[in-house]
Amino acid sequence: MNIVILLLILTFSIKHSNTYKLKNTYIPINYMYHNNKNILRSQKSKLFLNFLSNNQLANSNKQTCFFKSNIKSSISNIDNYDYIRKRYINTSNKNKLFYNITLRTNDGEKKIECNEDEYILDASERQNVELPYSCRGGSCSTCAAKLVEGEVDNDDQSYLDEEQIKKKYILLCTCYPKSDCVIETHKEDELHDM
């Protein structure tokens, strides 16, 4: 029943979506990301992506779904994996890996826990730590921060250039932790003064 509802929602949600060529027809694929609060953002999205990858997508070396706010997730039925980063969506907390993040904010140090598949900005909001943001898609500098210690995956962003990345600037709205981290927040002005 839930899959049928999801398919109906997808069929009727044709507004401003990126499209995919599915067996010689184009259909929109809207934002799908896990969150137990609503069906479009539930784990059912993962089931639908598997359905698309196994049954509907035209043959190609690379198929990537682009969702709202530039969030991307790769579909698993692909011949060439060299350029693909997979995101597995799972709402279960069993054996879930998380990292301790120390945020050096304008109001002092804040410590949060961030799941390995969760953006640092989302984790901070979940734990009532307010940080600046605008686009939530890695295409502006409002949530700019600087990585002091640790390692992150900031590949989902599209704003920072190579020089800024080498100087350890990150965008918290599209940044996954890969280890425990220390991060200085509120770095938008510093970023633009470079």
Swiss-Prot record:
Chief place of localization: plastid
MF (Gene Ontology): 2 iron, 2 sulfur cluster binding; electron transfer activity; metal ion binding
Domain named 2Fe-2S ferredoxin-type: residues: 99-189
Membrane-spanning ranges: none
Places the protein is found: Plastid, Apicoplast
Presequence extent in this chain: 1-19
Top-rank lineage group of the source organism: Eukaryota
Keyword ATP-binding recorded: no
Record text on cofactor binding: Binds 1 2Fe-2S cluster.
Role summary: Ferredoxins are iron-sulfur proteins that transfer electrons in a wide variety of metabolic reactions. By transferring electrons to 4-hydroxy-3-methylbut-2-enyl diphosphate reductase LytB/IspH, plays a role in the terminal step of the DOXP/MEP pathway for isoprenoid precursor biosynthesis.
Protein known as: Ferredoxin, apicoplast
Organism, as annotated: Plasmodium falciparum (isolate 3D7)
